[in-house]
Amino acid sequence: MLTYKQRQSLNHAICDYVRQNEGSDELLVQLESVLLPNGSDVIPQDPNLLERKWNSIVRLQSKIMELEKNCEELQKSIDEQQSSTNQISNASSDWCPRDTPSFQITLDASITALCLHPSLPIIFIGLDSGKLLRYDILNVELPLQSTMAHMDGITSISISLPNENGRPAYLATTSKDLNTKIWELELDSTLSHIKTLAGHEHTVSDCQFFERGADLLLATCSRDLYLKIWDISNGWCIKSFQPHTQWIRSLHVHGEFVLTGSNDSAIRLTHWPSGNGLSMGIGHDFPVEKVLILIPDPQHLQPQYQPLGFQHVASASRDGTIRLWKVSLPKFIPHRPPRPNPLDTTFKVIAVLTDHNSWVRDLRQFNDMLFSCSDDGSVKCWSLDWTNLSTTTCKKSWDLSNKGFQNCLTLDNIAFTGLPSRKLLFSGSSEGTLTSFMR
């Protein structure tokens, strides 16, 4: 037996059916008088609710089956994506660029600095003319943006990431014009100049963004012998000291420690908040062009080096060599800044790599590989064995000498960004040629 509401719904459906199929008015009046004697008792159907008709159960079952199918397809897609991500990650850990370049573009001045955007297919290029270019690496016919950033050559570029508190991404450029400029990156990577950091009295050689707590800081070094730490929020210099007696050409910051290389042919490790010099490496015959703190997998870091966060560094020099060093461990005293160990203040040379035939200009780490470029026109890839760095050998070499001296390199800085690594390597030459190796 049907309930009253069910009978009313059935009767109303019959009348609707006759009406929609153009039944005669006389028939419709007769049906309504018999089936719906109290038409006002019928509550109108809410269009936002599921229809209460006899086929509603069938429709509901069909909808359930459709949703289940969609869920299965989505789960399959997620599983495939995770599998693909794992394959990319595994492939990237031992990735080595192809034998031939993916593309080359020639610009109107020597390329002196390169920097990849950590997530977008964008590369920033600094020229010796002071021009800053922004290119889409998937379409390099024309630059996305060209800015005369400095009055003299750009020497380095560093990029920072936005944070959860709304801080935007920034780009820093240093130059021979004695200035460091800070640029804000919009969501589409468009550059807007926001401030100039003036304080150095000679060429600013290198820079690097790094975080300390919630603060974004920038380290710069210069031919005026000073290394400076800047607070980006207000543009103030919060620390300034002299780690070397000659031109500081390169720096690399890791936490509270900064590694520097100089024209005095030495490299030094300093605790920058206190300015305490901790140890140094002596062995190069000519000025040091580039220094790099080597970040190993956590399992390869010895327990006593945990407070430092690393135990090996690399340096590239005009003597044509790359040296791998083991850092002497400073003394860590609770509630005090670290101090040099009086019994061990000198780095130990682990390996001297001599495959380059001229000045070695730049160094970059990619997982267990070290990339270098030189005035001999070559780019080289070195295989790092963390258990025995003395066995480091050249894994692959690319001869780009027909494009001039190779001044600089860039690839994804995995340790800094924490983002998935991409199979990208770029080299910039003295003749203005950007060479790309993709996959």
Swiss-Prot record:
Q: Where is this protein found?
A: Cytoplasm, Cytoskeleton; Cytoplasm, Cytoskeleton, Spindle pole
Among its keywords, does the record have Cell wall biogenesis/degradation? no
Q: What InterPro entries does its record include?
A: Dynein_regulator_LIS1, G-protein_beta_WD-40_rep, LIS1_N, WD40/YVTN_repeat-like_dom_sf, WD40_repeat_CS, WD40_repeat_dom_sf, WD40_rpt
Q: Superkingdom of this entry's organism? A: Eukaryota
Q: Which Pfam families match?
A: WD40 (PF00400)
Tell me where the WD repeats sit in this chain: 106-145, 149-193, 199-240, 243-282, 295-335, 355-392, 402-438
Q: What are the recorded GO MF terms, alphabetically?
A: dynein complex binding
The Gene Ontology CC terms held by the record are: cytoplasm; microtubule; microtubule associated complex; spindle pole; transferase complex
Q: Name one GO biological process term.
A: cell division
Coiled-coil annotation: which residues?
55-90
Keyword annotations: Cell cycle, Cell division, Coiled coil, Cytoplasm, Cytoskeleton, Microtubule, Mitosis, Repeat, Transport, WD repeat
Biological role:
Positively regulates the activity of the minus-end directed microtubule motor protein dynein. Plays a central role in positioning the mitotic spindle at the bud neck during cell division. Targets cytoplasmic dynein to microtubule plus ends, thereby promoting dynein-mediated microtubule sliding along the bud cortex and consequently the movement of the mitotic spindle to the bud neck.
- Which HAMAP family does its entry note? lis1 (MF_03141)
Note the subunit structure.
Self-associates. Interacts with NDL1 and dynein.
Q: Which family does it belong to?
A: Belongs to the WD repeat LIS1/nudF family.
Protein name as it appears in the record: Nuclear distribution protein PAC1
Provide the species name: Kluyveromyces lactis (strain ATCC 8585 / CBS 2359 / DSM 70799 / NBRC 1267 / NRRL Y-1140 / WM37)
